[in-house]
């Protein structure tokens, strides 16, 4: 009997912990559309390496990359993606408007701004961040997600890291 009550209590604690994480997640706002335009599986073994910023130590390495997803996202003025991460690296291309990017690890909450025609690489692999449309027109971006688990999520909601005041 005591074992059964202990198991039940443990289950309640686990459920509360799981739901607590969901309650702390920060979903997006002002997302006009988020359309997956393609999803594919590599037919050969792919060992993906991306070097960012010219620093030889700043390399994103994805051995045995899994699925790849392409998505178009449109965010209204004042909208944002919510704090989130990705399982693998993401190449982002801005086609209209301005994207302001905030890194969850940056204690000073310094914005990085990208405009139409700009591209950047998000390292993924659990890196927490938020993208905001702080402009006056719709933000349109195209994203290519690498190393997505087959049939799995390519965007993972995360809780606000607390480094930004918005």
Show where each model-derived region lies.
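A short, N-terminal "cap"/entry segment at the start of jelly-roll beta-barrel domains
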Residues: 2-4, 8-9, 16-67, 112-113, ...
